[in-house]
């Protein structure tokens, strides 16, 4: 029995600065709106190296001590698995600058719910970033409907 599966790994990083977090207004037509910086893990790259690289490319900041704090995962209609690695850190250096991915800025954490977020489920994603008893955000299909569990 072959237990291998096709998986795509991406990451997302919550960078905190006091009571503010770094947000990005993505310009991609596939996934527009406000979210945290991040991107794909490249072949041969460690997960930690990937999140450090992606944050640098998208924000100009060099992060350190990124802490893996959870995942979001789902299977598409062709049984291809997607895994988003959630990281958080308060350690960074450099000068903030926007990129082709979108504008970046520091936002008060309590204002996030009032912004045009990239996903409708962002408030539950934030729970996985912040609550120590949660580590997974798992999407699954029930008939034609997409549902999710926080674990």
Identify the residue ranges that each predicted region occupies.
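Conserved N-terminal beta-strand and adjoining loop/helix that marks the start
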Residues: 1-21, 37
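Short hydrophobic/aromatic beta-strand or adjacent loop that forms the aromatic wall/cage
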Residues: 8-12, 82-86, 123
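Conserved hydrophobic/aromatic beta-strand scaffold that supports enzyme active sites
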Residues: 14, 23, 86-88, 106
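Conserved Nudix-box catalytic region and its N-terminal flanking loop in Nudix hydrolases
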Residues: 20-56, 144-151
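A short coil-to-beta-strand element that immediately follows conserved catalytic motifs
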Residues: 62-70
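Active-site-adjacent beta-strand/loop module that shapes the phosphate/pyrophosphate-binding cleft
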Residues: 73-95, 127, 133
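NUDIX/MutT-family hydrolases
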Residues: 88, 97-130, 149-150
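Charged phosphate-binding loop/patch that engages nucleotide di/tri-phosphates or the phosphate backbone
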Residues: 128-151
């Amino acid at each position: 029995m072959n237990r291998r599966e096709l998986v795509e790994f991406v990451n997302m990083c919550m960078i905190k600065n006091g009571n503010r977090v770094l947000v990005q207004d993505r310009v991609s037509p596939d996934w527009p709106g406000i979210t945290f910086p991040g991107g794909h893990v490249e072949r041969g790259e460690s997960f930690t190296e990937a999140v450090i690289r992606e944050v640098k490319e998208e924000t100009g900041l060099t992060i350190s001590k990124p802490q893996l704090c959870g995942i979001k995962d789902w299977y598409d209609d062709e049984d291809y698995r997607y895994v988003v690695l959630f990281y958080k850190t308060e350690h960074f250096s450099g000068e903030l600058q926007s990129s082709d991915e979108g504008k970046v800025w520091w936002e008060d954490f309590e204002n996030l719910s009032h912004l045009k977020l990239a996903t409708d489920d962002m408030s539950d994603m934030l729970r996985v970033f912040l609550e120590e008893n949660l580590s997974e955000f798992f999407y699954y299909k029930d008939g034609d409907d997409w549902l999710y569990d926080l674990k």
